[in-house]
Amino acid sequence: MTGHVRPFVIGVAGGSGSGKTTVTRRVIETVGGNGVSVLNQDNYYRDQSDIPFNARLNTNYDHPAAFDWPLLRSHLDALLSGVPIDMPEYDFTQHTRSAQASTVLPGAVVVLEGFFALYDEELRERMHLKVFVDADADVRFIRRLLRDTQERGRTPESVIQQYLEYVRPMHLSFVEPTKRYADVIIPHGGMNEPALDMLSARIRTTI
């Protein structure tokens, strides 16, 4: 595209319930809503419509293999080229991709938010700023418990079982190690106002 300026890409990673969405909101406030495109990695779980529902119940959402990495990369590349995308929507009650999609317009800043945002090397190479949101494990668990029971139709028992069997071991194996790729680490999660202020200042000076 003639005269197109490639967007500034920010990766926001961290454990489930660490406060990534709060950090993303701060980025939007800093840049201005119309200037930010947000790719939520939760929407890029693989389509499982060809798998029986009972089998989908055993999906390990906390393993890298659960994601549609080629689609995520292609959508990020489209936004970097100034092309709108139709971001899929994931239905966690049905454990598969919804028939709905949301149009995401290219902005001056693109935020990739997700606990595996810094996992994929090809995605990291496209990022100008990599952020890891750190928070205590008990805080992250409580936030996840509230979210999954209130927003995703889960029972407390199923959330606890999933945390013990999948979330905690997968976090230690795959998410926590990506902290070493971060340019900025925000301790104490998304409620750390001084750290969020520093992140905002850094963004203002680099875009």
UniProtKB/Swiss-Prot annotation:
Protein name: Uridine kinase
Gene Ontology molecular function terms on file: ATP binding; cytidine kinase activity; uridine kinase activity
Highest taxon listed in the record's lineage: Bacteria
InterPro entries linked: P-loop_NTPase, PRK/URK, Uridine_kinase, Uridine_kinase-like
Organism: Deinococcus deserti (strain DSM 17065 / CIP 109153 / LMG 22923 / VCD115)
Gene Ontology CC: cytoplasm
HAMAP family noted in UniProt: Uridine_kinase
Pathway(s): Pyrimidine metabolism; CTP biosynthesis via salvage pathway; CTP from cytidine: step 1/3; Pyrimidine metabolism; UMP biosynthesis via salvage pathway; UMP from uridine: step 1/1
Origin organism lineage: Bacteria, Thermotogati, Deinococcota, Deinococci, Deinococcales
Homology family: Belongs to the uridine kinase family.
Pfam families: PRK
The reaction(s) this protein catalyses: uridine + ATP = UMP + ADP + H(+); cytidine + ATP = CMP + ADP + H(+)
